């Protein structure tokens, strides 16, 4: 209710107001009579009559006068709506008249052919061409070439993305599909330019001034087009530099148009773009020829129109900042300067210093304009020209070298910084197997072992499993506190275990006991590939809370004794040291003593586990790890190769608890033979039965009646 233009709503309001007014309820018939009278008198609608009566407080004559005075404006709401609708029509017409079709920003109301964001869908070609021709004829300029090159509206003007993406999809097809229309435009263009320029032709400077006003607003140059044209232009520029035109006095271009000798001096253009030999026409037809016939002059078209033609009185101010930025950027990057002698790479009016090029067609603004010397100097310098860019090749080479230095230095910089990054004591985040050893020593300061003493570098794979990874943490201090204890404990154990370990590589000199607390962790690393990630999850550093877990794990880690698996002695010593530290009084050299094992292990192990800290979650060491320890320990000594690839298989419950599981790996018979050798087979068998029954009946004697009770 009460919305503008809603007649029914206003009439309802009028009725409600009329009903609520005092004394009106009894005058309904009078009001209806007055409404009829107003309608008959003025020919208005009933709603208008009611509103007029309401506005005039039920004054019949006042309401009639109000309606007659208002006339057409009586319903101001609907009248405004009509005005809005009528406004849209002239707007559409004005868009079309202005040639908005080729300059639209997206698909607006009147821009049928500007499809979407910068992808000019070339559907209504005819309307586009007609609009362009009409616009160009109105402007009195050469059609198509005035917008910064051939059919610039397609190239740089397409939607929001057209200017950045280089040529839109319609460029090449339009030039290829419409050669007749294009040549017709060329002929018109040539005749127009000839008429405008021929009188002034001998002094080329005037030809420039004659053609300058023909330009319309400058179109931005797409870097893709510039880069594409750079290679093609380079050959032409070198060719032109080798064959210099006699009538080209070098001029430093300070006038708004940069000297473009390949384009501005009309007589030299055939050499640059030899496809069309039309020496008498001014630059624009030739630019089109170059673009249409030989794409080598794309730069010329894109830049000369932007530069030379864009500077009429209205537009001069706008292109200069944009093109100055473009030129400076290109000069820094050395994009187009390979074609230096022929073309000022930047479309800027030669305010940019590097753009000084021998230019026969533009007069020098300063007082001292050298006439016979080909030199390059900064614009607005009225002293003798400073040979900033001595020659084409040298300038191009120097720019390329500079660009190479820039890019190479940017590439080299991260390399120089990387060692510093990896050396941050950030532990595992920067550990790489390829980084220098220095970074290891520094990044692993928190790991209380000396990585430089290790026989190999820690691999990336182990890195995420390390815990002490940043700075000298308390673990390092505690590790250092425990080092003397470890050394004392390992000193007697080393000779025993080195005798026990059969591989010769395991002989670690006893003169270096201080390395073993360090080696204890590094030697453990290679076993992560064996899918036993628990080894690294439990921190073997002494003085840390979970050292007893680690001791139990190191001894019984995978159902086999790790001391028999590890390739070098220090790790086995570390394991034994861990056991002694964690309160297990079991003698490590007794592992190889068969007689001791049968009698001692079952007796010692049960009470120890009862009094010890419990094994890590998922490991019930006492119930299924003893017998596999015995058999696999002996097997490892004689055939270590096969079990290094499947050391974790003995962790499976059926392996530890059933003879069938053992027979899968060929261990049962050998275990029995080992038991016979030790002379303690009855004890071992008794231990086996009691072990399984000790589990509360979860496992039968030899069969898996139930799943293993991991929480027991």
Swiss-Prot record:
Annotated disulfide bonds: none
Name the keywords, alphabetized.
Cytoplasm, Phosphoprotein
Spans of biased composition, class Low complexity? 241-255, 474-510
Renumbered to this chain, the Polar residues biased-composition regions fall at 431-458, 597-612, 683-696
Ranges of Gly residues compositional bias? 156-165
Q: Which InterPro entries match?
A: TC-DDR_regulator, UBA-like_sf
Compositionally biased intervals (Basic and acidic residues): 79-92, 125-141
Asked if the record carries the keyword Nucleotide-binding, the reply is no
- What is the consequence of disrupting this locus? Fewer progeny and embryonic lethality. Fewer stress granules containing gtbp-1 form in embryos exposed to heat shock. Weak, abnormally early expression of adult-specific cuticle collagen col-19 in hypodermal cells in 17% of late larval stage 4 worms but does not induce early alae formation at L4 molt. Suppress heterochronic phenotypes in a lin-4 mutant background. RNAi-mediated knockdown leads to fewer progeny and 50% lethality. Reduction of gtbp-1 levels in the germline.
User: Which family is this protein grouped under?
Assistant: Belongs to the Ubiquitin-associated-like family.
Q: What is this protein called?
A: Prion-like (glutamine/asparagine-rich) domain bearing protein pqn-59
Q: Which organism is it from?
A: Caenorhabditis elegans
Q: Which gene encodes it?
A: pqn-59
């Amino acid at each position: 209710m009460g919305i503008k233009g809603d007649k029914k709503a206003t009439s309802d309001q009028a009725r409600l107001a009329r009903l609520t007014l005092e004394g009106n309820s009894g005058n309904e018939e009078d009001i209806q009579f007055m409404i009829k009278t107003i309608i008959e008198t003025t020919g208005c609608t009933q709603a208008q009559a009611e509103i007029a009566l309401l506005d005039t407080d039920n004054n019949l004559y006042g309401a009639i006068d109000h309606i007659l005075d208002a006339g057409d404006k009586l319903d101001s709401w609907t009248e405004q709506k009509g005005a809005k609708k009528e406004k849209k029509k002239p707007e559409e017409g004005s868009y079309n008249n202005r040639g908005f079709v080729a300059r639209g920003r997206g698909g607006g109301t009147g821009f049928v052919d500007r499809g979407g964001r910068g992808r000019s869908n070339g559907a209504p070609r005819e309307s586009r061409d007609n609009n362009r021709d009409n616009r160009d004829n109105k402007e009195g300029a050469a059609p198509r070439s005035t917008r910064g090159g051939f059919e610039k509206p397609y190239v740089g003007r397409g939607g929001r993305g057209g200017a950045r993406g280089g040529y839109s999809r319609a460029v090449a097809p339009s030039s290829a599909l419409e050669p007749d229309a294009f040549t017709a435009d060329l002929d018109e263009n040539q005749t127009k330019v000839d008429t405008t320029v021929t009188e002034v032709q001998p002094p080329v400077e005037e030809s420039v001034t004659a053609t300058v006003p023909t330009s319309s607003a400058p179109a931005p140059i797409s870097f893709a087009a510039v880069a594409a044209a750079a290679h093609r232009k380079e050959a032409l520029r070198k060719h032109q530099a080798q064959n210099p035109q006699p009538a080209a006095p070098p001029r430093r271009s300070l006038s708004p148009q940069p000297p473009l000798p390949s384009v501005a001096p009309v007589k030299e253009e055939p050499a640059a773009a030899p496809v069309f030999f039309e020496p008498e026409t001014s630059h624009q037809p030739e630019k089109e020829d170059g673009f249409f016939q030989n794409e080598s002059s794309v730069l010329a078209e894109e830049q000369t129109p932007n530069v030379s033609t864009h500077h009429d009185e209205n537009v001069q101010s706008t292109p200069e900042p944009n093109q100055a930025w473009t030129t400076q950027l290109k000069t820094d990057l050395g994009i187009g300067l390979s074609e230096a002698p022929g073309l000022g790479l930047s479309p800027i009016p030669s305010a940019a210093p590097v753009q000084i090029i021998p230019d026969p067609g533009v007069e020098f603004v300063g007082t001292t304009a050298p006439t016979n010397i080909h030199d390059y100097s900064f614009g607005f310098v009225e002293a003798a020209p400073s040979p900033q860019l001595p020659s084409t090749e040298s300038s191009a080479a120097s720019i390329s070298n500079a660009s190479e230095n820039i890019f190479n230095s940017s590439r080299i910089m991260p390399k120089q910084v990387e060692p510093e990054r990896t050396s941050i004591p950030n532990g595992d985040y920067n550990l790489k197997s390829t980084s220098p050893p220095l970074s290891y020593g520094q990044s692993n300061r928190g790991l209380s072992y000396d990585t430089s003493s290790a026989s190999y570098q820690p691999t990336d794979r182990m890195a995420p499993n390390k815990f002490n990874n940043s700075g000298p943490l308390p673990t390092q201090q505690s590790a250092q506190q425990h080092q003397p204890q470890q050394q004392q404990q390992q000193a007697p154990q080393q000779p025993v275990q080195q005798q026990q370990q059969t591989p010769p590589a395991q002989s670690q000199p006893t003169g270096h006991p201080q390395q073993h607390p360090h080696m204890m962790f590094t030697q453990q690393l290679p076993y992560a590939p064996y899918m036993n990630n628990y080894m690294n999850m439990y921190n073997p550093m002494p003085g840390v809370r979970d050292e007893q877990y680690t001791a139990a794990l190191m001894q019984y880690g995978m159902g086999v004794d790790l001391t028999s698996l590890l390739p070098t002695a220090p790790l086995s010593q570390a394991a034994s040291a861990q056991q002694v530290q964690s309160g297990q009084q079991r003698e490590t050299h007794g592992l190889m003593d068969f007689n001791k094992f049968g009698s001692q292990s079952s007796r010692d192990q049960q009470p120890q586990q009862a009094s010890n800290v419990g094994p890590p979650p998922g490991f019930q060491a006492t119930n299924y790890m003893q017998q596999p320890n015995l058999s696999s320990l002996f097997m490892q000594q004689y055939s270590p190769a096969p079990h290094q690839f499947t050391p974790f298989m003995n962790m499976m419950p059926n392996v530890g608890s059933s003879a069938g599981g053992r027979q899968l790996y060929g261990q049962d018979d050998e275990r029995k033979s080992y038991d016979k050798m030790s002379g303690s087979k009855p004890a071992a068998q008794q231990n086996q039965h009691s072990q399984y029954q000790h589990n509360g009946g979860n496992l039968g004697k030899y069969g898996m009646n139930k799943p293993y009770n991991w929480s027991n």
